[in-house]
Amino acid sequence: MKETPLSNCERRFLLRAIEEKKRLDGRQTYDYRNIKISFGTDYGCCIVELGKTRVLGQVSCELVSPKLNRATEGILFFNLELSQMAAPAFEPGRQSDLLVKLNRLLERCLRNSKCIDTESLCVVAGEKVWQIRVDLHLLNHDGNIIDAASIAAIVALCHFRRPDVSVQGDEVTLYTLEERDPVPLSIHHMPICVSFAFFQQGTYLLVDPSEREERVMDGLLVIAMNKHREICTIQSSGGIMLLKDQVLRCSKIAGVKVVEITELIQKALENDQKVRKEGGKFGFVESMANQRITAFKMEKAPIDTSDVEEKAEEIISEAEPPSEVVSKPVLWTPGTAQIGEGIENSWGHLEDSEKEDEDEGGSDEAIILDGMKMDTGVEVSNIGSQDAPIVLSDSEEEEMIILEPDKNPKKIRTQTISATQVKAPSKKPVKKRKKKRAAN
């Protein structure tokens, strides 16, 4: 999958923020991201987190035949893998230019600097030596892979323990971990890589660039150094021309950062060794907290907003005072009102107005059936009452038989009013009825 390029707006935003000495995550120019080191249950297994960049390191060993030109030295082998789990742009099973450059830089930093005593890895000269293999897997990519990989490699080598061996004549005996305690590697110093990103043709400088900052940078300078301020390797990429003063300034900054990282590594190794001796719980399950994958979530970053607050106060002080707030609604014409924030609405009740309209218009259409009696003596005014049921039928007359105790059945004829007969009288008789009422 091809990497998604940055838009022009994002690129201009990043460059403008760098010109103002600001970064997206709130760091200063020379600040490193938080470094966290976790160890597994086996020796030589660790995970290093540099911000959101995560690298897994695993060290293994085996007895092999030495090289012909170096019969008394062991073999060191480094392998870095970039999987699609770290970033979709990485293609599996393909040696990209970035991967080749990172592997070569790791070999120059760790193997060519002689940080590990390879002669101590020899078992029988010219026959058996230890081959130490360091496998590094990038789990998540958020920029500055080389720094995280170098820290993971040196931490895994310091934490690793090889099995103990003994030689009697031509026989080589390999002891298990239960028979003898494993032996740590002989490490002289800890070389650590520190990356510097340059922008605007070397005008601006950032330490530990993130993934987005790497996309807009013009060049990269990597300095590998130990805590004794000895430069192990230095590499510049990007095609920019650096001055001698710039390189010296970067080396001084790298010396300070390397001392801090070395102290962090030694403290993590001591804590792990202490927990293992005391018989406590150790491993990734105990040292790494549960993490949840969330979408549309922004992490809080400590950002200094004092300058923004000062500008806001200046704008408010220079602005004109606000006009007086009207506390009551202004009625411009009858039947109108003003709706605003903090003002109570003064609209009339719609139900009351509707009832008044119904009373005025319904008086003309009222049905007055008082005093009207049918031949049967049943008053029509009782039709709408709840006690007397309304019977709708097409027939004019019906026969009803009433059964009473100790009496003969009686037949009573009642007259029902059909639905077509119950009609509202016209307006003329209603008006006459009103006149009669007025006369009375």
From Swiss-Prot:
Main localization, broad class? cytoplasm
Q: Which GO terms describe its cellular component?
A: cytoplasmic exosome (RNase complex); exosome (RNase complex); nuclear chromosome; nuclear exosome (RNase complex); nucleolus; nucleoplasm
| Positions of crosslink type Glycyl lysine isopeptide (Lys-Gly) (interchain with G-Cter in SUMO2) | 297
Q: Where are the Phosphoserine modifications?
A: 65, 306, 346, 393, 395
Localization of this protein: Cytoplasm; Nucleus, Nucleolus; Nucleus; Nucleus, Nucleoplasm
Task: State the Gene Ontology terms under molecular function.
Answer: mRNA 3'-UTR AU-rich region binding
Name the GO terms of the biological process aspect: exonucleolytic trimming to generate mature 3'-end of 5.8S rRNA from tricistronic rRNA transcript (SSU-rRNA, 5.8S rRNA, LSU-rRNA); nuclear mRNA surveillance; nuclear polyadenylation-dependent rRNA catabolic process; rRNA catabolic process; TRAMP-dependent tRNA surveillance pathway; U1 snRNA 3'-end processing; U4 snRNA 3'-end processing; U5 snRNA 3'-end processing
Listed Basic residues bias regions: 425-440
Residues recorded as bearing N6-acetyllysine in the entry: 297
Keyword annotations of the record: Acetylation, Cytoplasm, Exosome, Isopeptide bond, Nucleus, Phosphoprotein, RNA-binding, rRNA processing, Ubl conjugation
Q: Does the keyword Aminoacyl-tRNA synthetase apply?
A: no
| InterPro entries, per database record | ExoRNase_PH_dom1 (IPR001247), ExoRNase_PH_dom2 (IPR015847), ExoRNase_PH_dom2_sf (IPR036345), Exosome_comp_Rrp42_subfam (IPR050590), PNPase/RNase_PH_dom_sf (IPR027408), Ribosomal_Su5_D2-typ_SF (IPR020568), Rrp45 (IPR033100)
Q: Which family does it belong to?
A: Belongs to the RNase PH family.
Protein's job: Non-catalytic component of the RNA exosome complex which has 3'->5' exoribonuclease activity and participates in a multitude of cellular RNA processing and degradation events. In the nucleus, the RNA exosome complex is involved in proper maturation of stable RNA species such as rRNA, snRNA and snoRNA, in the elimination of RNA processing by-products and non-coding 'pervasive' transcripts, such as antisense RNA species and promoter-upstream transcripts (PROMPTs), and of mRNAs with processing defects, thereby limiting or excluding their export to the cytoplasm.
What interactions and quaternary structure are annotated? Component of the RNA exosome core complex (Exo-9), composed of EXOSC1, EXOSC2, EXOSC3, EXOSC4, EXOSC5, EXOSC6, EXOSC7, EXOSC8 and EXOSC9; within the complex interacts with EXOSC3, EXOSC4, EXOSC5 and DIS3. The catalytically inactive RNA exosome core complex (Exo-9) associates with the catalytic subunit EXOSC10/RRP6. Exo-9 may associate with DIS3 to form the nucleolar exosome complex, or DIS3L to form the cytoplasmic exosome complex.
Task: List the protein's name.
Answer: Exosome complex component RRP45
Q: Which organism is it from?
A: Bos taurus (Bovine)
Q: Which gene encodes it?
A: EXOSC9
